[in-house]
Amino acid sequence: DFISSDDPTAWRSGDVLAYDRYIKAYDFYAGLGLYSVDGSGLPIMVCVSYCDFNGLPVDNAGYCGIKYGWAIFGASDVNYFSEAVDVVGHEFTHGVTSSSAVGNYYANASGAINEAYSDIMGNLCEMMGGYTSDTEWLVGENSGYIFRSMSSPMDYKQPVKLGGTYYMPPTDTPSPEENDLGGVHQNSSLLAQMAYILYKAGMSLDEERSLWLTSIELLTPTVGYKEVHAALLMSVDINGLDARYKDVLTEAFRAADMI
């Protein structure tokens, strides 16, 4: 059942903040003509007091998929993650990539690529809206816990090179508990760092938003790094961006041993 109230003091502040953050994420994509996660105005439900099947609080924020005609998101009582625009934008982007790529093989490289897109678009949502003073492309700096850094991944024990320090190799038996599903979060920095590299090379936030969103539409469920590189080069052309960014991307991908 849905509960309503005319009393503005009847709602918990954390729940209201989570609601507000999802509005901001929705508006971020709507500014590009993409309404909701499916691009066609699918209604959104933010479930507060996010729990697992045993009724225990989930110490995370989450995109739970499309259920009964709703895009479902979870906001927990045991953290402040859903009060941070970049974290909420991250989760919202999971819905966008799931719809755009007709699913995603969420493990190994393709899963890490999925996570990178969420970090990138979540940060762009936060920075373009003026909801942070961060210029180092941190993830979660306003949630009470910094998850990752796109400018200095190794500061948070993430790799900057395929097969390098902190890199988690792919696995035939992906498990969220044992190997992070083949490093979907651990290795997300490999692609996510490219957004910061482009930013330092002079690409504006508005140009980044167009670049990355267009490239999402070119991905497949089992995409690899070479395919993402090709999609980004194509996106530079599609969006009429300075051709020198293709050289920046190619140099950065090669430095990371991704092509």
What are the residue ranges of the model-derived segments?
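Extracellular zinc-dependent metalloprotease catalytic-domain scaffold
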Residues: 1-189, 194-197, 251
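Extended acidic/polar alpha-helical scaffold segments
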Residues: 209-210, 225, 229
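Long hydrophobic segments that form regular secondary structure
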Residues: 197-208
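Short amphipathic alpha-helical segments with coiled-coil-like heptad repeat character
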Residues: 35-40, 203, 239-244
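Long, well-ordered core segments of solenoidal/helical folds
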Residues: 212-216
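Beta/coil-rich, acidic/histidine-enriched accessory regions frequently appended to metallopeptidases
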Residues: 227-259
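Hydrolase catalytic cores
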Residues: 201, 217-222
